Structures are given as structure tokens and as C-alpha cells.
């Protein structure tokens, strides 16, 4: 982190304050050429900055004691911030840490496609927001993010929060079950390996995203790629449900699980079935090739 920038909004989404401060790098003191071209400053300006721990304490004080929630453009800002907090042995944020990923919310509401992750500049231009300061400066980007947020439809905002995964549950009692209108999410404690994780009933069982009824699987769990498994079940009240398990590595070599369950269409079900058949055929061909070689 080489800069912290933020814009504060009140409960009616009015801009009431701004914060910005340059941070003097402690480990990586030279910018990569690609990053230097992107930013609006260089190493000479960074050398005038203050240490991260000093700036962060000032930033936390600026945030205030009242309850607040972070709004970011993409999920990585909080990850980088917490990595630096750990480096300086600073107190963690409250757990679990909820935030609004405005990039994702914008993609869902305005592009109707969660898989598209538009740049902040594209969103600003698409919303006809006046551009009067350079992008890729933390304080300016925070201001533009606030302006985009002001113009968004906030009718379903309470349901559109995300949970930061940098810190995961330390025990079963801390595991997180988060229910939303169109999906549910379950975040587990750490397991020794993927096999142990999938043996846990809270992970392997599939429950309806809406009524939480245990479902019979029409497609059993299968490995979609190295870190993802998928299954499909059917609720007689709420239709087809797709379960997806993502494995996240911990610092000590273990894994924790992020499981999501969403409603899907029959067409999406057929696509998943085709994917399972495709992977099964590839494995069969691979086994046959090994047999012919031996």
C-alpha cells in the first residue's frame, strides 16, 4: 500500500469528508515501470510519505467511532490493507468484515452480468460523471467511487454486501452462514486438506438457498478445476440449486471453504451436466493412454 484515500458519506449518501495520504514504502522502495506509468507520481513523492502504521492510525481515527461499512471498487483493496496491518502487527478489523463491492454491484445492476468487472473509469464515463481529476490516485478514485455509488440504485443494497475472506473462521463456532435473496454463502474453518473438507457434512450437504431444506443431488459433487467443485440439487418449492465449493489456501498450508448455493435455470443445469460429461471423458481418455503406455 503506497497511498490511502477515502471519501466519507452520511446515511443519505451525501459526501461529507475526504481523506488522502501518501505512504513511504518500507519493503519495495522502487516502483515497477508499468505501475509508475499508471500512477500520477513516482518514487520521489513516495519518499515524502509517512510510515503505514502512522497513516493507518490516522485513517482509522478519521473513520470515527460510529458504525460504518467500507465500499470498494473490487475486492482486493481490503486484502492489501490487511496484509500491511499484519506486517505492522496492528489490531484486526472486527470479524466477519462486511463490505460493499461496488464494482460487482455495478456489474449486476447496470450490466446485468456479474462476470463483467468494469474499470472505475468506464463506470464513471458510462454514468456521465464529470471527470475533473486524474484516475489511479487513491483519493481521487475514492471520490469517483462515491459519485458512482450516489447514482446507483440502492433499493436492494442491504442484501448486496460481501464478506471479506482475508481472515477466515478459526473454529466451527465462528463459521459464517450468510443468506441473501438469490443465494446463500457458507464460510468454514480451516481443514487439513480438500478431502477432509469435503467429508464435513456442512460442506458436502446441499441445502436450498431459500428455505434451507436439505436437497437430493441430481448431479453429485465433481471437480470442475483445481480449486472448485460443483453439484446440483432440486428443491420442490424453489427449483434447481447449484452448489459451488471454492478452496482457499491458508498461510500454514491448510484450506478453508467458501460454499455458495444459487438458483439456476434448466439451461444452466444442462450446461453443468455437459461440463461434467466433458471432464469425465477427458479422465477416461487419460486413463486409457496410461494403460496403453504401460
Predicted regions and their residues:
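Acidic, Mg2+-coordinating catalytic module of metal-dependent nucleases/exonucleases
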Residues: 69-76, 80-84, 118-182
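Short, polar/flexible loop-turn hinges at active-site or ligand-entry regions and domain interfaces
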Residues: 41-48, 91-93, 130-133
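Acidic two-metal-ion nuclease catalytic site recognized across multiple nuclease folds
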Residues: 151-294
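Short alpha-helix plus adjacent loop in nuclease-associated cores
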Residues: 100-115
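N-terminal globular core domains of eukaryotic regulatory proteins
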Residues: 42-44, 104, 122-125
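Substrate-recognition/cap helix-loop segment adjacent to the acidic, metal-dependent catalytic center
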Residues: 79-97
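Conserved non-catalytic scaffold segment of RNase H-like nuclease domains
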Residues: 1-79, 243-285
